[in-house]
Design a protein with these regions (language model features):
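Conserved short-loop catalytic and cofactor-binding motifs
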Residues: 23, 40, 67
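Active-site activation/catalytic loop segments of kinase-like enzymes and analogous catalytic loops
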Residues: 32-62, 73-89
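Active-site acidic catalytic loop and adjacent metal/ATP-binding pocket
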Residues: 1-33
Length: 113
């Protein structure tokens, strides 16, 4: 089961816990999608990505080739989503997202540690 929308606004932080909300896109998926989506949607830089991956993959090794494919897929997915919504609604937030994702697609990140 994957959340499929791990954006900053879907995390609630309390003094002792972190909660995920907004499960409208949740469903069966490869967990690498959630990992890649978290990196992509939160625009993690290289060091933040390395820190996140080291914390996540404590019992197994990260498949970097698979992660790279999912990172590109997430950028393409959210670029397409933002393009459609910007065209339909004309809200600047969607234009900002599509520009960010376009730049990520144009200059893909390489993850290795």
């Amino acid at each position: 089961m994957c959340h499929n929308d791990l954006v900053e606004g879907n995390f609630l932080f309390t003094k002792n816990n972190i909660f995920l909300i907004d499960y409208e896109y949740a469903g069966l998926n490869d967990y690498y999608f959630d990992i890649a989506s978290f990196i992509s949607e939160n625009n993690l830089d290289y060091q933040e990505t390395v820190t996140f991956l080291k914390a996540y993959f404590t019992d197994e090794e990260c498949d970097f080739k698979k992660l790279d494919v999912f990172l590109r897929f997430c950028d393409l997915l959210w670029y397409t989503w933002a393009s459609l919504l910007y065209e339909k609604r004309g809200e600047e937030v969607y234009n900002e997202i599509l520009i960010t994702k376009y730049n990520s697609l144009k200059n893909p990140r390489s993850i290795a540690y």
